[in-house]
């Protein structure tokens, strides 16, 4: 197998390169498809289409993927490292961001995390009313609660641009 084990030299970079090569060998990736890779994790904003030619070599490749397909509708977007891959761009998963902020409040670490959490939230906040197109009612409630908490804490800027 090509994939490297955790703790070995350039594990992350090697795993990322292998994941990209494997994915593009197995699937037809249309031009304009948004793709994210990190180590052995990946996501894309469209449903992968298996290349017929992959069946000819599949039994000779030890690397196997753990595939999860999402319908790319509110509540069912592909996720990647805590981010939802939506038609409007990436947004931090509202429930996870809310839970992380609540934990920070509980352990007294809000001063250390509020700016980073505001930066994470900014991707969704900047969508304005369009955010309602990509969130479920529950996700919208978590988003609103996180915005409210961060505004109440003060000193945060949701208009941050990466």
UniProtKB/Swiss-Prot annotation:
Keywords from the UniProt entry: ATP-binding, Helicase, Hydrolase, Multifunctional enzyme, Nucleotide-binding, Nucleotidyltransferase, RNA-directed RNA polymerase, Transferase, Viral RNA replication
What is the name of the protein in this document?
RNA replication protein
Q: Which family is this sequence assigned to?
A: Belongs to the potexvirus/carlavirus RNA replication protein family.
For this UniProt entry, the molecular function terms from Gene Ontology, in alphabetical order, are:
ATP binding; ATP hydrolysis activity; RNA helicase activity; RNA-directed RNA polymerase activity
Lineage start = Viruses, Riboviria, Orthornavirae, Kitrinoviricota, Alsuviricetes
Highest taxon of source: Viruses
Please tell me whether the keyword Protease is annotated for this protein.
no
- Renumbered to this chain, the signal peptide range is none
Q: Which reaction does it catalyse?
A: RNA(n) + a ribonucleoside 5'-triphosphate = RNA(n+1) + diphosphate; ATP + H2O = ADP + phosphate + H(+)
What Enzyme Commission number(s) does the record list for this chain? 2.7.7.48, 3.6.4.13
The organism is: Lily virus X
**What is this protein's function per UniProt?**
RNA replication. The central part of this protein possibly functions as an ATP-binding helicase.
Coiled-coil region(s): none
């Amino acid at each position: 197998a090509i994939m490297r084990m955790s703790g070995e030299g350039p594990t992350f970079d090697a795993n990322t390169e292998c994941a990209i090569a494997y994915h593009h060998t197995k699937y037809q990736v249309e031009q304009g498809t948004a793709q994210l890779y990190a180590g052995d994790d990946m996501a894309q904003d469209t449903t992968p289409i298996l290349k017929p030619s992959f069946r000819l070599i599949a039994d000779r490749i030890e690397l196997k993927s753990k595939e999860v397909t999402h319908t790319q509708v509110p509540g069912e977007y592909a996720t990647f490292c805590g981010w939802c891959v939506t038609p409007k761009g990436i947004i931090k998963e509202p429930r996870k961001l809310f839970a992380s902020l609540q934990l920070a409040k509980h352990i007294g670490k809000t001063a250390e995390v509020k700016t980073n959490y505001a930066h994470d939230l900014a991707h969704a906040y900047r969508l304005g009313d369009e955010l309602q197109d990509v969130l479920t009612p529950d996700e919208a409630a978590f988003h609103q609660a996180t915005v409210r908490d961060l505004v109440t804490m003060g000193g945060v800027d949701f208009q941050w641009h990466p």
